Amino acid sequence: MRTESIKTNRPMDLLLQYLQPISVALVVIALVWNYGRRNPTKKLAPEASGGRPIMGHLHLFNDGELTHRKLGAMADTYGPVFNIRFGSHKTLVVSDWEIVKECFTTNDKLFSNRPGTLGIKLMFYDADSVGYAPYGAYWRDLRKISTLKLLSNHRIDTIKHLRSSEVESCFESLYSQWGNGEKSGEFAPVRMDSWLGDLTFNVVARIVAGKKNFSANGDVGAQRYKAAMDEAMRLMRFFAFSDVIPSLSWLDNLRGLVREMKKCASEIDSIMATWVEEHRVKRNSGGNSQLEHDFIDVCLDIMEHSSLPGDDPDLVVKSTCLDMILGGSDTTTVTLTWAMSLLLNHPQVLQKAKEELETQVGKNRQVDDSDIPNLPFIQAIIKETMRLYPAGPLIERRTMEDCEVAGYQVPAGTRLLVNVWKMQRDGNVYKGDPLEFRPDRFLTSNADVDLKGQHYELIPFGAGRRICPGVSFAVQLMHLVLARLLHEFEITTVEPETKVDMAESGGLLCYKIMPLEVLIKPRLEI
């Protein structure tokens, strides 16, 4: 049974279909639930109204409105911290940066676990990955490898030539799409979101596994991996009973979702295992150059000179590198796509960016990494994009012990949901119109705010122990790609005076729904 045969992906429709025959049990469970929550000695955060037995507040999210937007509207009613129940999971929703700071400083250790999903468990190595391993010695060892060996500033500098090589290759392909200069004075159409996806995936795959050319015209192995990852992302968007009501997890088997995910997982694992073995064979034959040393090589170095955590070293290598590919490619693609969309809808901002580039770089050479510190407005554009359209609009954690947040008791096992999207649109922090795209705010009133997780009013990469370890790498890549795009090409919408559709998707990542079709032509005098 293929997943496409599932009649609906709307949680309420599915729940009604399967739960109506057991309505008597719902009444019994409701009585138990009401009795258990009556504890006058503890002050709990207010709970959103409308909750139901077993399904909790799921039915409120069945109207098609995106989860982060729905939760943002609920925060306007219940305040910056409130409780909600996603099925059987009690969840504390926080939309205020000061309360989030308390969670990720005072209570950071207690909120250091991430609840997984069916897709994460079956397709992305679950508790064996640095992204979802439970807090403890094993996770700390994995995290140390990621931050000190794979993504340290020294390592990023060491692999800069690999990144530059892939970026240059992708820009050459963009010039080729325009026509190698044969259409002098004319614009050519480009699917910009696809090109950005190829670029970021190529860069990350090169530095992680030494793989090149993941575009549609790439080699068969590259296309196979890209197809598997696209399928995994598609399956992740399906509603899974296991994620909200574990006792109904058997329905995911009945619907064929588990089988589809396991099939996809087998394909991904097979490819990752092949990559690891290819690296091992190359090393043993003495054909591995230090200049081409990628993340898999670094992990194998660690295996040779000490040891990797866990009982299966190859599993650690595969899961760590898969985490790097997932975290480094999609987030960057999503952010750059939103940045270009916003700039096309705000031509005055686009013009200001071009003026900065012409002043600092000129039109006789390409932008270099060394130029970025002199391009504060380009940097501000990335910040403002991630403020308005964070790639991951919600951050999820789970508390290991009872704790207190904003004066409210939070029982052990409660899930924490930080509404980054809502929090970063706070008019008390971002003066003027917080919903307006104004990069210059990061050069004036919010100039001291950065993306490294220490300023809680802007945390698109997360914060605390679980902050994304690849912040520096991702930001450097985004700055360079955006600067080069704006510097080297005139870019317009296909239809003059037509606004780019800014409709966004829900789920783990906030994708732009409609393709970003643009017209380009070169603008440099070289």
Curated annotation (Swiss-Prot):
<dbReference type="InterPro" id="IPR036396">
    <property type="entry name" value="Cyt_P450_sf"/>
</dbReference>
<dbReference type="InterPro" id="IPR017972">
    <property type="entry name" value="Cyt_P450_CS"/>
</dbReference>
<keyword id="KW-0472">Membrane</keyword>
<feature type="transmembrane region" description="Helical">
    <location>
        <begin position="14"/>
        <end position="34"/>
    </location>
</feature>
<dbReference type="GO" id="GO:0033075">
    <property type="term" value="P:isoquinoline alkaloid biosynthetic process"/>
</dbReference>
<comment type="function">
    <text>Involved in the biosynthesis of the isoquinoline alkaloid sanguinarine. Catalyzes the conversion of N-methylated protoberberine alkaloids N-methylstylopine and N-methylcanadine into protopine and allocryptopine, respectively. Can also use (S)-cis-N-methyltetrahydrothalifendine and (S)-cis-N-methyltetrahydropalmatine as substrates.</text>
</comment>
<keyword id="KW-0560">Oxidoreductase</keyword>
<keyword id="KW-0408">Iron</keyword>
<dbReference type="GO" id="GO:0016020">
    <property type="term" value="C:membrane"/>
</dbReference>
<protein>
    <recommendedName>
        <fullName>Methyltetrahydroprotoberberine 14-monooxygenase</fullName>
        <ecNumber>1.14.14.97</ecNumber>
    </recommendedName>
</protein>
<dbReference type="GO" id="GO:0020037">
    <property type="term" value="F:heme binding"/>
</dbReference>
<dbReference type="GO" id="GO:0005506">
    <property type="term" value="F:iron ion binding"/>
</dbReference>
<feature type="binding site" description="axial binding residue">
    <location>
        <position position="468"/>
    </location>
    <ligand>
        <name>heme</name>
    </ligand>
</feature>
<dbReference type="InterPro" id="IPR001128">
    <property type="entry name" value="Cyt_P450"/>
</dbReference>
<keyword id="KW-1133">Transmembrane helix</keyword>
<dbReference type="Pfam" id="PF00067">
    <property type="entry name" value="p450"/>
</dbReference>
<dbReference type="InterPro" id="IPR050651">
    <property type="entry name" value="Plant_Cytochrome_P450_Monoox"/>
</dbReference>
<dbReference type="GO" id="GO:0047084">
    <property type="term" value="F:methyltetrahydroprotoberberine 14-monooxygenase activity"/>
</dbReference>
<comment type="pathway">
    <text>Alkaloid biosynthesis.</text>
</comment>
<keyword id="KW-0349">Heme</keyword>
<keyword id="KW-0479">Metal-binding</keyword>
<keyword id="KW-0503">Monooxygenase</keyword>
<keyword id="KW-0812">Transmembrane</keyword>
<comment type="similarity">
    <text>Belongs to the cytochrome P450 family.</text>
</comment>
<dbReference type="InterPro" id="IPR002401">
    <property type="entry name" value="Cyt_P450_E_grp-I"/>
</dbReference>
